[in-house]
């Protein structure tokens, strides 16, 4: 009888040990990583190739945009971070990269560099970008607000840019993070068009610039 009880106790102990080794199914969802992209802006053929050179210095962001997670601000004073959608590079570097690509194409030049790379020698324009808003603001749109200081020929011209873009719906009618990122890329492209006009006018000697 004692042997039977001992065997039962041993069997129960083994079952408990095996049960403790079972790994529960994970609820972890791997995040999706996103990159801002160039949208193929048209070049300015009125400018000779390489006529303009520029440098995009380190983009300044508010603290909440320095997080790797995509951000939404559905109402004033409320921020929502998306755990499963993240930037694939530091956001300030991604914005500078796409600014350089789009602005270089619009100004018909390869003579540019962007942070974190060093400024090229004899650079004509130094652009200091401060981004104040860069996120989805409701279920239908994103918002870009930025200030740019254009340093040229010992002068500084400060300009402000605001752009709201409606989101395109996915096939099922929902607004996904991919639509957000594409709309944010479009906002940067339009910001570059705005800056290119300013730079082109100063390069042409516009007296009002």
Give short role names for the model-derived ranges.
Residues 23-43, 50, 106-156, 173-174:
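Surface-exposed short loop/turn segments
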Residues 92, 96, 100, 185-188, ...:
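Extracytoplasmic/secreted envelope proteins and their assembly/folding machinery
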Residues 21-92, 203-209:
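A structural "domain/chain start" motif
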Residues 78-86, 155-194:
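Short secondary-structure boundary motifs at beta->alpha junctions and helix caps
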Residues 1-10:
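Bacterial N-terminal signal peptides that target proteins for export
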Residues 100, 104-108, 196-200, 204:
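Sec-exported extracytoplasmic/periplasmic mature domains
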